[in-house]
Each structure stands twice: as C-alpha cells, then as structure tokens.
C-alpha cells in the first residue's frame, strides 16, 4: 500500500520541487504517475483511501461517461446526416439549414455557465441525470414536429442544448477527480474517442434509419431511448468522487470561492485563455465541416457523375455514410496519435501538449484546402485529403482537455469548462455553420440555378476553414510560452501552498528564520 504524507506537512512538496530543478530527480508528474499506477495495481478491487471508489469502479464510471458523450454527439450529428431531407421537408435555404445547428449550439453555450457554476458546488451526478432526462425528452418531441412549423423544430433543437450543457461541463471534472497524471490523460483520450465516433455514428445511424423507415423523423428517435439507459447507469452504477482529493492527498472538502473570484482567476490564466481560443478555431472548423461536409460531397458527386441526390422522396446518403466512417476512424487515430506523441515528447519538453496541438492545426490547413480543390475532379482524392486533414485536427481533443485540468484548480474546473464552452461555441461552431450557409447563398445570388453553382458556392465558403486552422495553430504556439508557469501555480494551489483567494495569489507563505514569511511565487516556481 502506498504511503501518504501527513496533511499538515508541506515540506516534502517544497523539497521535491527543489530536487526537481536542482538535483535532476524525476519530476512530480512522473512520480505521481508512478504512485497512481502502483495504487491501481494494489487497490484494483479495493476502495481508494481518498476517493472512496475502487480503481475498477472508476474505470466503469469513465465508460459510462464515454457512453453518454457518444450519445450526445450521435444526436447532434444525426441532424447533419439527414440535412438534405430536413431542408427539403421544411423548404428552407442554405442559411436556414445552418441555423438548425446554430440554434442548438447557442442554447448549449448560454446554459453552460449555469451548469458550470452548479457543477463546482453541488452533486454532479444528480445534475447530469436531470439534464440527460430533459435532453432525451426534447429530442423525442422534436421528431414529431410537422413540416409546417420550422420555427418549432428550431426551438426543440435549441432545448436539446440543455442536456448537453449539463453533461459536458461536468464529465471531464469527474474524470480528473478519479485519476492523475498519465492515467488521467489516457482516460481523457478514451472519453474523447466518443467525439469522432459519435459524430460518425450520427451520420450513419441517421442515414440508415431514414432509408429503412422512409422518413427522416425516425432518425431522431434512436437516441432518446439510449439516453434513458444512460440515466439508469448514472443512478445505479456511477459514484461521485470528492473534488480534488487525489491532488491534495486528503479527502477533506475544498473551500469554494465566489463565482466572481473564480472568473477573475480564470481570466488571469493565460494558458487557459489562449488554449480556449485555440480550441475555438477547432470548433469553428469542425462545426462547419460536420454540418456541411456530407452536403458538399453530395453536390460534388452530382457534378462529377451527373446524378440526382433525392429521387423518390428520399435522398442518397452514400456520402454521409463514407464521411461518417472517415470521421470515426480519423477521430480515434488522431486522439491516439496526439496523446502518444505528447506523452513521449513531454519527457524532453514540458510544453509538449500545446506544441502538438499547434502542429496539428497548422498541418491540417493545406489538406483541408486540397480536399475542396479536388472535389469536382476526384472524389477519391477528396476523401484522402479529408482523412489526413481530420486526423491532424483530432490530435488536440484530449490534449486541450488535459491542459484545462492541470492549469485550473479543482474548485474552478466546471466553471472553466463552461467558460471554454461559451467562448469556443460563441466564436466557433455556433456561427460557422450559419456563416458558411450565408456565404454560400450570397455567392449563388443572381446566378442561374445549377448543381455546379451550388457546389462552387459551398466550396468557396468552406475554404475559410483552412485559414482559421492556421490562426488556431498560432494560439496554441502562444500557449506554450505560459504553460509551465501556470501548471506549477495550479499545483501549488491544489497542495494548499497558495491561497485560492486571488488577493494573495502572487505570494506564498514559507518558513524563514523560525517564522512564516510571504515570498513571491516566482521564487518557488524557479
């Protein structure tokens, strides 16, 4: 059994920090990783001393959270998978088609801070149960909206954001309270596999259900029943760990600060802010591609093969199926590759996470551009370039989440998740699908209607994504300048060596000549 330090003794931490810099011993992250893995072996079937949850149960909880995340993305991208049928049923333009996704993202975005505040202070399992139940009910109701009431369909899709906001702000913080260091990164990478897999399954399930039932409404009736199962798993299987117990080496509850103090601290955290803006560009690109990718490929096929997409009342979803499969594979491959590269690179460079994210974003831009440029001549080449571009985009999913968790203290993590969601969606995928649709409509205006014009207009609009990707790479490169200092500062907070109140955040109390003395944080961090 791994021994624990006394709660009141902080000297070993300072000694460990000094040794890390001056004597060349292994850094705290490596030691905590080794310690945690040893505990996992010793206590796989026993209750952890600090969390009160066994390692086996912790893994099961992560699997449940993965399942719910999978459902969330399945539901979100089922709509994208059957968008041509929805557009035809409601007789709407490209801009209004983009509005379907934008309304959902806006609701999700504005409710995230509410659930972030609640998630830092109240029972997280209960909050998720209520949110997922509401999401499942509203999703089911949206499938019964008549074709004459597009505005009502928009409202129901907007309300779906309530459930997703309740879940996405909380789930990563639960994983952070169950695991540390490399184990946390591995669990986060598994959790974020649900993003690409859910997206891909959304396209596939949506198109297959529509083809089988002959009605796109049935595509929206798959996830509600699965959502009910998720609620039951949360109630009867999942447990809630104490916040920050593993990092503080004590199960004593943390003291919450005011919401205004939390926000001030987060806004003064450059690594958090810059990585959030970097992730915003990821959201912009993926949001635009997720909604418009299958539609653009369908239009390209119409131009190349002179085919008609929607004969007999049902649209051809071969491209949705292929795009969904590519999204699944590239997402898994990208997340695994990003985590593995970062894990190896960390051994020589503590700035590995933001640097890997930056390389992924910048490298994806030319491949996304080429995928659009070749779409009217070779769909095979287009799919190859999409595969490479989406793989590079997916390098950062788990890494951005990990950055947030290790530069933000435990009592502010749900709030930080919420703030990141607001910014990334407000400036990212809340507007990008609608913006792409508006630009496409404007390019088509005044021109004779044809499949070629429809394809070209969407092609030129989607080219914005390549340039946004390069901007995102710049944000992640800048994050690398601050990541070490912000990480060490968060570690001091979690160990109780730095006050949570930001009024004293720049100074730390240490023994000096027999009495306590405040010294600058930088003197400890160096």
UniProtKB/Swiss-Prot annotation:
Region (Disordered): 1-44
Pfam families: MFS_1
Reaction(s) this enzyme catalyzes, per UniProt: a 1-acyl-sn-glycero-3-phosphocholine(out) + H(+)(out) = a 1-acyl-sn-glycero-3-phosphocholine(in) + H(+)(in); a 1-acyl-sn-glycero-3-phosphoethanolamine(out) + H(+)(out) = a 1-acyl-sn-glycero-3-phosphoethanolamine(in) + H(+)(in); a 1-O-(1Z-alkenyl)-sn-glycero-3-phosphocholine(out) + H(+)(out) = a 1-O-(1Z-alkenyl)-sn-glycero-3-phosphocholine(in) + H(+)(in); a 1-O-(1Z-alkenyl)-sn-glycero-3-phosphoethanolamine(out) + H(+)(out) = a 1-O-(1Z-alkenyl)-sn-glycero-3-phosphoethanolamine(in) + H(+)(in)
GO molecular function, one term: transmembrane transporter activity
A Gene Ontology term for the protein's cellular component: membrane
Subcellular location as annotated: Lysosome membrane
Membrane topology value: Multi-pass membrane protein
Keywords in alphabetical order: Lipid transport, Lysosome, Membrane, Transmembrane, Transmembrane helix, Transport
GO BP term (any one): lipid transport
Membrane-spanning residues: 59-79, 98-118, 126-146, 159-179, 187-207, 218-238, 272-292, 321-341, 355-375, 384-404, 419-439, 463-483
Family in the record: Belongs to the major facilitator superfamily. Spinster (TC 2.A.1.49) family.
Function: Mediates the rate-limiting, proton-dependent, lysosomal efflux of lysophospholipids. Selective for zwitterionic headgroups such as lysophosphatidylcholine (LPC) and lysophosphatidylethanolamine (LPE). Essential player in lysosomal homeostasis.
Protein name stated in the entry: Protein spinster homolog 1
Protein's organism: Xenopus laevis
């Amino acid at each position: 059994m791994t021994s624990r330090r006394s709660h009141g003794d902080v000297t070993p931490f300072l000694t460990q920090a000094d040794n890390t810099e001056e004597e060349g011993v292994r850094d705290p992250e490596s030691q905590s990783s080794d310690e945690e893995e040893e505990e996992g072996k010793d206590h796989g079937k026993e209750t952890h001393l600090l969390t009160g949850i066994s390692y086996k149960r912790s893994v099961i909880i992560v699997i449940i959270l993965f399942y719910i995340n999978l459902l969330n993305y399945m539901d979100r991208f089922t709509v994208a998978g059957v968008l041509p049928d929805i557009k035809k049923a409601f007789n709407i333009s490209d801009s209004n088609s983009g509005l379907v996704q934008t309304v959902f993202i806006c609701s999700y975005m504005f409710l995230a801070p509410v659930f972030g505040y609640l998630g830092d202070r109240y029972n997280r399992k209960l909050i998720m149960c209520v949110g997922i139940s509401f999401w499942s009910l509203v999703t089911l109701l949206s499938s019964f909206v008549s074709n004459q009431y597009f505005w009502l369909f928009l409202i129901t899709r907007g309300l779906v954001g309530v459930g997703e906001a309740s879940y996405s702000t909380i789930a990563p913080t639960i994983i952070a309270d169950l695991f540390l260091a490399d184990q946390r990164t591995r669990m986060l990478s598994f959790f974020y596999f649900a993003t690409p897999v859910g997206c891909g399954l959304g396209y596939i399930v949506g198109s297959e259900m529509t083809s089988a039932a002959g009605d796109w409404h049935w595509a929206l009736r798959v996830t509600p029943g699965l959502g009910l199962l998720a609620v039951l798993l949360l109630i009867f299987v999942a447990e809630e760990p104490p916040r920050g117990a593993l990092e503080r080496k004590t199960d004593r509850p943390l003291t919450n600060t005011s919401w205004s103090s939390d926000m001030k601290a987060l806004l003064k955290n450059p690594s958090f802010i810059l990585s959030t803006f970097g992730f915003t560009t990821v959201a912009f690109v993926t949001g635009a591609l997720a909604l418009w990718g299958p539609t653009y490929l369908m239009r390209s096929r119409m131009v190349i093969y002179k085919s008609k997409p929607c004969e007999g009342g049902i649209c051809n979803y071969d491209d949705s199926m292929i795009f969904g499969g590519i999204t699944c594979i590239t997402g898994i491959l990208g997340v695994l590759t990003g985590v593995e590269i970062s894990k190896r690179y960390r051994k020589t460079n503590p700035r590995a996470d933001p640097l890997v994210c930056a390389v992924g974003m910048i490298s994806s831009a030319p491949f996304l551009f080429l995928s659009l440029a070749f779409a009217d001549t070779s769909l095979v080449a287009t799919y190859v370039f999409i595969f490479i571009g989406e793989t590079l985009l997916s390098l950062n999913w788990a890494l951005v989440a990990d950055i947030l968790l290790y530069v933000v203290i435990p009592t502010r993590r749900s709030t930080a998740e919420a703030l990141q969601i607001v910014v990334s969606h407000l400036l990212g995928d809340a507007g990008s699908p609608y913006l792409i649709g508006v630009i496409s409509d404007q390019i088509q205006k005044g021109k004779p209607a044809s499949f070629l014009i429809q394809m070209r207009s969407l092609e030129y609009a989607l080219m914005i994504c390549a340039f946004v990707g390069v901007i995102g790479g710049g944000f992640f490169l800048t994050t690398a300048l601050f990541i070490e200092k912000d990480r060490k500062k968060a570690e001091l907070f979690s160990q109780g060596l730095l006050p949570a109140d930001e009024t004293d955040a720049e100074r730390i109390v240490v023994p000096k000549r027999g009495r306590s003395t405040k010294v600058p944080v930088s003197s400890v961090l160096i």
